[in-house]
Amino acid sequence: MTLAIEWAEKYRPQTLKEIVGNKKAVQYLRTWAEKWLSGIPDRRAVVLHGPAGVGKTSTAHALARDLDWEVIELNASDQRTAGVIERVAGSAASMNTFFGGKRLIILDEADNIHGTADRGGMRAIAGIIKNTLQPIVLIANDIYGLTPTIRNLCLEIKFGSVQSRSMVPALKKVCESEDILCSPDAIQQIAEGAGGDLRSAINDLQAAATGRKTLEVEDLSTSGRDVKENIFKAMQRIFKSTDCKKALEAARGLDESPEDLVHWIDENLPFQYASKDGNLEDIKTGFGYLSKADLYLGRVKKRQNYRMWRYASMLMVCGTSVSKTRPYPGFIKYQPPSLWKKMGQIRSKRDLRDNIASKVGEHNFESMRYSRNNLLELYSRMLKNEESAIEITAGLGLELEELIYLSGSTKASKKLQKIYERAQELLLEGNEESDGAEFFRTPAPPGNSKEDLSVFSVNNSVEKDGKHSERLEVPNSRTSQGGQKTLNFGFDIPPEISPETKNSENNTSDTIKPGNLAPDILAPVTLTPDSFTSDTLIPEQDQAEIDDIGIKSDSLTSISLEHDSLKVKNSSSLPGPVEKEAFSDSEPIENSISPELSRSVKSVNREPAIKKVSDNSEKSEVKVSETPKKVESKTQKTLFDF
């Protein structure tokens, strides 16, 4: 006999054929799963609900093995907040497997997702079910522990208690595998004492057979297992019985507190004691006992004295049983408390309202509280216009349920469905072309926009006469990252340039041809004697002075201008080429040209600056300052403006 693991886990069914009991429920689950093989069914998730130990989780795992599906499971031992569920189950539900098969997502004990530890879990499950591409199985003991939204999205399959006659063959098989001789009476007693819980029956068998090779009835424990009473059976015993003791036993066997039990009795008492002749005395008497029980429940909360639960339970149970004056035959379908349903609806609407307020606040850079108190009513009024409703739905990314709530409707009308469909089309177009609806496009936060700084550009164009003219272009408008347009401040045309500046630039353009560079940046250009004519370079007032000096333009063979260095190579007769880089408006070039030419150079006003060269150097070399001077507005002369 091996005690390494529990027998209930060791002999867990591996296929659907090995499942004990609930054959119809297993068949329903198999039919639903086969629909996934040909596409996505209408109900993308299923809820297996029923008592503990009847094989719900084992059936889900057996289904995955039969269909060769991968399994991802989240149970009560895992943290199941909204973030965890979306990270684990959400990612698994939205992606296909590597080999193209299906992945079964199992959420065990889904009805126990509540409290601070599992904050937002129910809402995350509902969102995953709506968009899942993989089958999802929810397992719950109490179907009413799930929200109405999840229940409407899922296919409900109920698992009932396993009959004792179905347990006996399974228990005999376990005894044979463990080499234990167990009498039929002992097996029958274990099966009947399990209360329909096969897992508990196997655990009882393991506990009784520990250290034994044979098992008889005398070896079994005299105390039986505490069996939880079903709420519907307990309600039947309370309303049908006239014995107060039996009614109290049924109530004590429930896994319900007196605060919950009083709501069950309050909901079903008018239906159970309804009389055809219109006599309401029994109903009046029953509610009188319930009101007194409610007083004790209030004192329990106020004084924290839980001993008063005893008196409250006796009043609500025994008072209801003895309040009837005659029996009420017939079957009554007992309903869960409507108060819980209303509270669930209110909680669901409150969560829906907060989600909408969060989206509105994010779009308007406001808090959720401010949006909830001040902006939701404004947006609700804006939905009355169909075009505005479409832009709001697309801009905020509203779901159909959120659109229904914000519009104040109770159900999805054809108009709202049309608005939602057009908003989805607008979102698809926005993803392909731009950022969606222009009016409700979320602007970029302050300080994070990356503006295009190249607003102004200099356009160097070559005119017909070969001269370069610089034109400052100002765009009419530009669009920022957030989609907002910026005005051009009235600069539809380039700013006017003063005539003096134009003359200065025209004079410079004949001697210096910078290409596509800005006018204040020198580029290497070679000038030949053909480039200099008296008509273009030498003013008439300076022609006489040049003739007196005796320098002819054809004696200049070449002048080379470079950006980094300046070299002037010449003698009194200028036999060779003259290489020039920059000129100074303050100091003359010595030992390179004649004194007469040096005096003429003093009158030259050029943009770059040069430094004085030593007297003993054979050839003059000067360096250009790294930061060139700005072009002055006054008229400037070139080298040959003598």
UniProtKB/Swiss-Prot annotation:
Annotated region described as Disordered, given as residue ranges: 432-452, 464-518, 568-642
Superkingdom assignment: Archaea
Binding site for ATP: G50, P51, A52, G53, V54, G55, K56, T57
An annotated Gene Ontology molecular function: DNA clamp loader activity
Keywords per UniProt: ATP-binding, DNA replication, Nucleotide-binding
Gene3D superfamilies xrefs: 1.10.8.60, P-loop containing nucleotide triphosphate hydrolases
Pfam families: AAA, RCF1-5-like_lid
Any Gene Ontology biological process: DNA replication
Composition skew (Basic and acidic residues), residue ranges: 464-473, 604-635
Biased composition range(s): Polar residues: 476-487, 500-511, 589-603
Similarity comment text for this entry: Belongs to the activator 1 small subunits family. RfcL subfamily.
Functional note: Part of the RFC clamp loader complex which loads the PCNA sliding clamp onto DNA.
Oligomer and partners: Heteromultimer composed of small subunits (RfcS) and large subunits (RfcL).
Protein name: Replication factor C large subunit
Lineage: Archaea, Methanobacteriati, Methanobacteriota, Stenosarchaea group, Methanomicrobia
This protein's encoding gene: rfcL
